[in-house]
Amino acid sequence: SPMKDLGPTDKRGTEVHFLPNKSIFMPITDFNYDTLLNRLRELSFLNSGVDIELNDERTGKHVRLESEGGVRSFVLYKNTTRHAIHKDPIYIQKTVMQKSAKDPGKEIPVYVEVAMQWNDSYNESLAAYTNNIAQRDGGTHVTGLRLAMTQAFKNYIANNDILKKADKFDITGEDMREGLTCVLSVKVPQPSFSSQTKDKLVTSEVQPAVTAAVSEGLNTFLEENPDQAKEICNKIIGAARAREAARKAREVTRKQVFGGGLPGKLAD
């Protein structure tokens, strides 16, 4: 409908009404408070300083969401029920000008914001977003993040002689991600996704931009915070030792199953 002139006012802003069409959205036309709260909480963390209020007039529930810490606060929130092995999350924020794959003479601004903190669990918790939209299946931003992490930690562990001489194994990406809670947010103009659901980012320019930003940030953190770096590296090495021990145990079991009853040379 056309706009109406309501006269002078000191109020500013935009009011949007969404009323679901029952002929399209049936049988679900009722709004779930918890679903809205979780999504608005995400947006609050992903957009630092934005003030969001949720008011449910059906029940009288009201909550105000305002996060000044960005994804750093998001990671702390996610780790509330977990025991972190280092106090402060690693926080990286940078805009990288990346050459366009389609037009090499043009640069694309890629805003990268990431926070990570390790805890004493054995599972990885990674949430990745592009322009505030979650990607359940990852994509080029997650690939860039993992590449940077692998390079940074392997170099730091090797250069600081943290591994013992008896440790005859390589550190893998899975070792580094054990117990990791991480939130990765990128903002990029005209992103491309693998499907209409936007579950996977495929914009090629994002991967090198994220790798560059995270590599620089991680290297700086590790050099400036040796105590926390040692705690994280010990966690990573512990995961690698456990993986190697499990591999050796499987080999012993396999030899016992398939090698039993055979002559010594054949059993070997």
Q: What does each model-identified segment do?
A:
Residues 1-268:
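GHKL-family ATPase ATP-binding module
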